[in-house]
Amino acid sequence: LERGKASAEREIHIYIREGKYYLDTPLVVDAGEWKNKRLTLSAYNNEPVVLSGARKLSLKWVKQKNGIWKSKTEADKGDQLFVGGEKRILARYPNFEEGTIFNGTAADALAPARVKRWKSPGGGFIHALHARDWGDMHYVITGKDDKSILFEGGYQNNRPSNMHDKYRFVENIYEELDAPGEWFLDGKAGYLYYYPYPDENIDNEIFEIAEIPSLIEIKGIENDRASDVTVRGICFSQTSRTFMADYEPLLRSDWAIYRGAAVFIENAERCRIEDCEFTGLGGNAIFLSRHIDGCVVKGNYIHQIGASAICIVGDTSAVRSGVFKYEHSVPYE
């Protein structure tokens, strides 16, 4: 990309050879740096190319009790772990049960007797349905006192509500690491804990942990729009989860939105995302933000992701007397 920006050529085609490329920051195509150029990013000759938001870990396992192994790690963050390319389960209660709401919920997820077992739950997550089953709400645990845990969040839903008293679960808590396939990262101490499946040889597996939420950002501004960028034939994978990122309410709708994605396009014209794959993502796959004209999203395979496949969201500044929270209204005069 740096060579392309500096080139005098008007047509820039960057071919990417077969392989998996781990990014620690997103690739950014900024309108101000690509004026009057057409850019194409594509896999070379249909070779398999993966852009990953994960870090590949180098681990030396030491056996612990109760089926758990641990290893020192340089990773200090991450809430999606992949073993041999397969996503594993962040330590949770109740345990994972495929095909159920949230893959398992329990009314006693926050019961005092259970909370009392948690030595240091800060950084854990609570996931729950809206009290009237209208959607999901998410919270981060900030600590605990003598009586209960402390937490914040729930802003992903634009209809204020308590969390559901039955459909809820907790995760990312060390004391809940008790089933095959579960894991926990102690980022402060620098240890990864894992409970392998019975037939899993962890010394021979590749461990990867997702660290960034975005892989490509194509960005312009209102008076200087990004244009003529094509992304073709690339697999985007292993981004971090975004449910606790900043969310925007959208004109009294039931929901709020995280303005970001694995591929994020903002204030752009004539851009194309085609024949790509999006999988193993922690959030949105493709986001078309604010002014978008003549852009095409075509032929992509989007599966096993954490949020929406394709978002098209304008700018609320285009609305006069906008009302954002569900409970607000504009007086009639």
Predicted regions and their residues:
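Extracellular polysaccharide-degrading/modifying enzymes targeting complex plant/algal/animal polysaccharides
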Residues: 1-272, 277, 318-330
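Glycine-centered loop/turn positions within well-structured domains
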Residues: 49, 271, 284, 295, ...
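Active-site proximal loops enriched in glycine and acidic residues that flank catalytic Cys/His/Asp
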Residues: 196, 290, 314
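Carboxylate/His-rich catalytic cores and anion/metal-binding grooves
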Residues: 229-232, 241-245, 295-301, 306-317
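Low-complexity, polar/charged sequence tracts that form flexible coils or short amphipathic helices
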Residues: 265-266, 278-279, 288-289, 302-303
